[in-house]
């Protein structure tokens, strides 16, 4: 059993613990292989031999245990093991690590096999602990200007025999921003970007008037046919996307008053034209959506029903309320291309629905692997750029299958997508 003081819970990573101590590792691998359902398990008989081979090939602690075990067994046999196939409940208890979170008096707060589950369950208490040990003035609210000098990118405070670590960030509170402490750097970065965006918008004139003056009537009309809420919400989405683009161009979030001043001047000077450019692209996207939806209405040929359902699900992931900021400026042109690929697919599907279904099943297989892989990641890891990139690779895979003539920016295949997932560390 691993004892973890509550204030240190956010600093402990699960990776590595599941490998057990070296003396129990072989026994654990054998037990895991034997836990597989019989149709899968028979590919790895005798289990002790495969356990020995795995331990001879794998680099302990380099990857999470199951990631490494699945990868090496697949290399040895060509058999892919679904994550759900492992039956941890059949592994003897003495081979499993237990995590116990304790308070200042060493009293048990909670314990379990999953460190991430404990982090999720005790997140509020960890946050309270961070706020309690923070110096006065670190956390603030109701801010409308950058009036706090330099914002530290990390914060440490000694408590008893250990150091409590937190990550400060600006937090978007709509009419103002706040400074809050986060228990991990991923959430800090995500909050900081949104909070910085809000503080910039609070300190520059709105681009809406300029947008109405400069946007062609056709584009204005396209925005008013927005099926995803009020047009003003869509315009706000375009503005937020524009600020994000300019923050990105400047090198990302800033942490000093001087840096904010320089970024503010850049955004004030360039945001109007940037938002007009974005709104024109959004109008093209919404027009493509409108045209596709027209084709999806009416009687459905049963041979095309599954393909059409797949298209609707794909579109829901591409264009939704908040998609402009959600997808980001760099993806607007890609989003339009993916919609154009859907139009090409509809043309081909009407001619050969069986070929469409065969290609769709290949994409579905990759999507299922991606979803399983995504579910394994800590929640705060799923929004990181390298993780999000996999989703866009699957969109490119669709283009290569259904509308190859449109081209992709790089070579793509189902195998390349799976390899890219393997190379990303949790």
PLM features per residue range, with description:
Residues 1-426:
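A positional "C-terminalness" feature that preferentially activates on distal terminal regions of long
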């Amino acid at each position: 059993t691993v004892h973890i003081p509550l204030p240190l819970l956010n600093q402990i990573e699960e990776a590595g613990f599941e490998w057990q101590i070296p003396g129990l590792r072989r026994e654990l691998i054998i037990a895991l292989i034997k836990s597989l359902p019989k149709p899968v398990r028979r590919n790895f008989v005798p289990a002790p031999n495969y356990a020995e081979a795995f331990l001879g090939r794998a680099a302990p602690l380099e990857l999470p245990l199951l990631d490494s075990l699945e990868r090496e067994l697949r290399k040895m046999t060509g058999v892919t093991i679904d994550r759900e196939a492992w039956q941890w409940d059949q592994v003897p208890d003495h081979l499993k690590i237990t995590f116990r979170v304790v308070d200042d008096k060493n009293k048990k707060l909670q314990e379990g096999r999953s460190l991430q589950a404990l982090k999720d369950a005790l997140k509020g208490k960890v946050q309270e602990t961070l706020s309690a040990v923070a110096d006065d003035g670190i956390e603030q609210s109701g801010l409308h200007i950058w009036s706090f000098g330099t914002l530290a990118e990390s914060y440490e405070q000694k408590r008893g025999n250990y150091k409590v670590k937190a990550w400060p960030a600006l937090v978007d509170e709509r009419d103002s921003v706040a400074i809050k402490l986060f228990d991990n750097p991923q959430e800090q970065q995500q909050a900081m970007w949104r909070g910085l965006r809000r503080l910039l918008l609070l300190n520059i004139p709105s681009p809406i008037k300029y947008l109405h003056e400069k946007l062609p009537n056709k584009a204005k009309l396209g925005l008013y046919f927005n099926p995803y809420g009020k047009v003003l919400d869509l315009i706000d989405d375009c503005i937020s996307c524009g600020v994000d683009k300019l923050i990105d161009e400047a090198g990302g979030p800033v942490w000093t008053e001087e840096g904010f001043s320089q970024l503010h001047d850049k955004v004030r000077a360039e945001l109007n034209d940037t938002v007009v450019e974005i709104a024109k692209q959004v109008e093209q996207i919404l027009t493509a959506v409108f045209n596709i939806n027209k084709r999806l209405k009416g009687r459905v040929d049963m041979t095309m029903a599954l393909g059409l359902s797949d298209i609707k699900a794909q579109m829901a992931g591409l264009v939704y309320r908040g998609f402009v900021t959600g997808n980001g400026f760099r993806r607007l042109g890609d989003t339009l291309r993916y919609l154009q690929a859907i139009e090409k697919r509809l043309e081909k599907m009407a001619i050969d629905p069986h070929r469409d279904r065969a290609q769709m099943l290949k994409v579905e297989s990759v999507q299922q692997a991606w979803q399983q892989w995504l579910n394994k990641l800590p929640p705060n890891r799923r929004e990181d750029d390298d993780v999000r990139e996999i989703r866009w690779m699957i969109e490119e895979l669709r283009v290569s299958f259904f509308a190859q003539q449109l081209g992709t920016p790089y070579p793509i295949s189902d195998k390349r997508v799976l390899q890219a997932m393997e190379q990303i560390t949790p």
